[in-house]
Amino acid sequence: MQAPPPEHCPGVESENAGKGSACSGCPNQGVCSDPNKKLEDPGKALVVESMKDVKHKLLILSGKGGVGKSTVTSLLTRYLARSNPDSNFGVLDIDICGPSQPRLMGALGESVHQSGYGWSPVGIEDNVCLMSIGFLLGSVDDAIIWRGPKKNGMIRQFLSEVDWGNLDLLLLDTPPGTSDEHLSVVSYLKDDTNPESLRAVMVTTPQEVSLLDVRKEINFCKKQNIPIVGVIENMSSFRCGHCGNTSEIFPAKTGGAVAMCAEMGIPLLGSLPLDQQISKACDSGEDLTTFKNVTSEALEGICSKIMASIS
């Protein structure tokens, strides 16, 4: 019989399974350390129970830092919620060391409350809620210096101990790369009986230095059997507010996201411009989707494709 996992369990998928400091004294240690005896992470059953009313999960991935994953996550959430008022949306910030969503969603200074059903996520709109480790810190300047097992334990708590309620879509803002956080969240959320319930959206900028890492992220999803909804090319162009001319800040010398999507057989969802209004809205936590501009027009097409893919 499996025992409940210790607080900082590295997870059975981790190379530290059965070997970490948290494993000492755990009744499951012998099972986890033996590749021939490994059982399903006992924490997964708790996650499955907690997430049973969350219909769809969408990983926002990139591979490269600085391409705007967090910004795109907040923009998608805001636009989806505004254009689908009868649906409920959640955001989970699993960028443990660099949580950005509290600022982007205008929720700095908010706190998480405990109820009989677990942590209550912070309400952003009537149909949007948010959970981030940023709400658990004493100061926005506090550094989180954690190794993989502790990060994995935090992610497991977010998935199993937060009262998400009934959600039509949960968007997960992820850190760059294919790190412990990615392996952990995929192992908990992937449902072999319903593989379409967990999907991914890739975010890239046009230049090859970003596309190189996004290709790796696409291959990660293929190896993990995670369906990819498509790719969003962020900061694709810049339109001058004075003269109206459009220029490429990050030239697509190898064809940009268009060429990569054709090469790898992945849909291109659309392109978002480098927009000064986005920058201002990110710092202030303002909802940019209330403005009618080139960004909101691009979001309309992107969000329509996302909703169609999960319908």
Swiss-Prot record:
Binding sites annotated in the UniProt record for [4Fe-4S] cluster 2: 240, 243
One biological process term in Gene Ontology: iron-sulfur cluster assembly
Chain residues that bind [4Fe-4S] cluster 1: 9, 23, 26, 32
Keyword Cytoplasm in record: yes
UniProt GO molecular function: 4 iron, 4 sulfur cluster binding; ATP binding; ATP-dependent FeS chaperone activity; iron-sulfur cluster binding; metal ion binding
Chief location: cytoplasm
Entry note: cofactor: Binds 4 [4Fe-4S] clusters per heterotetramer. Contains two stable clusters in the N-termini of Nubp1 and two labile, bridging clusters between subunits of the Nubp1-Nubp2 heterotetramer.
CC terms in the record's Gene Ontology section: cytosol
List of residues binding ATP: 63-70
InterPro entries for the chain: Mrp/NBP35_ATP-bd, NUBP1/Nbp35, P-loop_NTPase, YlxH/NBP35
Region feature Disordered, mapped onto this chain: 1-20
Family annotation (Pfam families): ParA (PF10609)
Subcellular location: Cytoplasm
Listed cofactors: [4Fe-4S] cluster
Keyword Cytoplasm: yes
Residues of the signal peptide: none
Source domain of life: Eukaryota
Keyword annotations: 4Fe-4S, ATP-binding, Cytoplasm, Iron, Iron-sulfur, Metal-binding, Nucleotide-binding
Subunit annotation: Heterotetramer of 2 Nubp1 and 2 Nubp2 chains.
Family according to the record: Belongs to the Mrp/NBP35 ATP-binding proteins family. NUBP1/NBP35 subfamily.
HAMAP family, sorted: Mrp_NBP35 (MF_02040), NUBP1 (MF_03038)
Function summary: Component of the cytosolic iron-sulfur (Fe/S) protein assembly (CIA) machinery. Required for maturation of extramitochondrial Fe-S proteins. The Nubp1-Nubp2 heterotetramer forms a Fe-S scaffold complex, mediating the de novo assembly of an Fe-S cluster and its transfer to target apoproteins.
Protein name: Cytosolic Fe-S cluster assembly factor Nubp1 homolog
